Amino acid sequence: NTLYKEQAHIIRSIAAEGNGAVFLGRCAEIVLAGQPEVYSFFICADDAYRTRRAGTHYGGMSLKQLNEIEEKRSNYYAFYTGKKWGDPQNFDLVINTSRIQLEQAADLIIDYVNRVQGE
């Protein structure tokens, strides 16, 4: 619980600086809920894509290992937020990267933020 509180404090402090930041995980969309100009995205992929990517980016982890990590993330998220990890209602946009390239996903995120900001 102390670690979560410290992480939340750091996330809020960095966000308050107003220089823009990207937070990966750590329940940041919940920690920063209600703050202006906060956008949250959930990136997912099917098992085939996750397995292929794990072979090139995560030391060749097996799907079983990836699922164990995902279960830990899910439990962490549920414990600290009371919400279901990956629930689309908790995010502005959910992107399945097994259907589009990562660069296209980044473009979608940029386009989303620009549209919300009225550009």
State each model region's role.
Residues 60-103:
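Small-molecule kinase domains that catalyze NTP-dependent phosphoryl transfer to phosphate-bearing small molecules
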Residues 1-20:
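ATP-dependent small-molecule kinase phosphotransfer cores
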Residues 34-57, 63-69:
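Conserved phosphate-donor/acceptor-positioning beta-strand/loop module used by diverse small-molecule
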Residues 21, 38-40, 94:
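Short, well-ordered beta-strand core segments
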Residues 8, 102-110:
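Short, amphipathic alpha-helical "lid/cap" segments that border enzyme active or binding sites
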Residues 116-119:
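C-terminal helical "lid" subdomain and adjoining coupling/linker elements of P-loop NTPases
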Residues 25-30:
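Short, polar loop motifs at secondary-structure junctions
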Residues 18, 35-37, 91:
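Short, well-ordered alpha-helix to beta-strand connector turns
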